From Swiss-Prot:
Gene3D superfamilies: Imidazole glycerol phosphate dehydratase, domain 1 (3.30.230.40). The keyword Amino-acid biosynthesis applies. This is Imidazoleglycerol-phosphate dehydratase. HAMAP family: HisB. Its EC number is 4.2.1.19.
Amino acid sequence: MSRKATIERVTKETQIKLSLEIDGTGEAKICTSVPFLDHMLDLFARHGLFNLQVDATGDIDIDFHHTVEDIGIVLGQALKEALGDKKGIRRYGQATVPMDETLASVAVDISGRPYLVYHVSLPKVKIGEFDVELVREFFQAVVNNLGANIHVNVMYGDNVHHIVEACFKAFARAVDQATQVDSRIQGVMSTKGKL
């Protein structure tokens, strides 16, 4: 079973092509014109062992908002498509990741019900030119388009780069765990018989 998807999204604001292979080796080829987002997506692929290719252009002369949000939309859609009927997946994943002085935890339930809990206090508003409020927008877009319940919690941290990086690494590891196929699971991991 090949769990792959390629999604293209073209609007007046962005042009995005994203290819994802869930059962990958962590290979990434990322070009979004948003360097900090490139770094986070590279981390997501590596720490989740997903193969990920993203080619994106957007109206970054205005700001990064549309590009970041739309990549979140497309990543959520790609995960959903690649998972298909979700038969045999563990459904739940959780990871806690330290990054120097920071500790971040992400829990994922690929339930079909989108809901984001985001308890992340960021000590400043920008990392270089990147508005850190866009991290929440990215996760919200993934949640809405994957149909998942995702809780992002930072227990403590001072360095904003470390905080965001720990969140993305924990997110990758939690999604990897939730998407793993377990041969003991018959159908889907739900008493309803459907996710």
